[in-house]
C-alpha cells in the first residue's frame, strides 16, 4: 500500500494555536505531512516567509513525519504534485470556512483529479482564533499570548525592536 501524504497550507501570518492544533492532529493521519508556508510577494506580512518557516520548523522538531516547505506565488495543487501529495488538509472553524474552502476544492479537483481534501474541525476553544484577529490585536498593542505559540510572540517582539 502506498504512503498517505498530506499537505496543510497557509500563510501562517502569524501561526496560531489553531494552526498548531490542526497540524499536530493531521500529522497522526499521514505517513508524511508537508506544511506549506505560502507567501504572496505583493503583500507585506508580520514576518517573512523564511521567518514563518523557521518558526514552524522549531515547533515541530522531533515530529519526524512533518516537513515544512516554503512556496512563493504558486498554486497549492502544483506544490501537491511536486511532493506526491495524496490529500490536502484544511481546517474548518465554521460554515463560512466550509463555503470558502468548497470553492477551492472545486478548482483543485479540476486541476488535480484524484487529489482529495480532508477537513478537520477546529476544537471549540480554538474556533474563534484567526491570524487576522491576532494581527488586529497587535495593531492595537494587545497581548496575543493566549492565541499563538510563545515563539511567535517572541519573534514578533524581536521584529518590533528592529
UniProtKB/Swiss-Prot annotation:
GO terms for molecular function: ATP binding; pantetheine-phosphate adenylyltransferase activity. It catalyses: (R)-4'-phosphopantetheine + ATP + H(+) = 3'-dephospho-CoA + diphosphate. It is found in: Cytoplasm. Substrate binds at residues 11, 43, 76, 90. It comes from the Bacteria. SUPFAM superfamilies: Nucleotidylyl transferase (SSF52374). GO terms for biological process: coenzyme A biosynthetic process. HAMAP family: PPAT_bact (MF_00151). This is Phosphopantetheine adenylyltransferase.
